[in-house]
Amino acid sequence: MAIEVQPAVSPHLVVSDGAAAIDFYVKAFNAVELGRVPGPDGKLMHAALQINGSTVLLNDDFPEYNDGKSSTPIALGGTPVTIHLTVTDVDAKYQQALDAGATVVAPLEDQFWGDRYGVVRDPFGHHWSLGQPLREVSMEEIAEAMKHQQ
């Protein structure tokens, strides 16, 4: 029997404490844990969550498999990646993330591209943007609005 494959893009996050990260994502983003695989030393080798209808993978940091270097955003001094969640009721979802322990990177505001949008940093250094479309805006309108941004 053939396995049905659904093409997808799923972020795979490296965190300093996988169990705590799962707890945070459940509280902050209503994540559903799909499964976890602990290693012999108790560190999390692999976990799968569903957040906002998409799969997010994560594991504990394993410097011993990376030339002794940590690869968490905190150890690297930040992250160049932001994971975006398109949601309804963005004000409540943003506050939920803050209440769970996230910190503000960009405050929640109505944006020129038509979304109400903000960015938070989770306790593990990963950035999450939350946006709710409020109105349709053409690419031409966005380009024109960009001319007036500081």
Question: Where are the language model's segments positioned?
Answer:
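Vicinal oxygen chelate
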Residues: 1-12, 22-123, 131-150
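Short acidic-aromatic low-complexity motifs
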Residues: 15-19
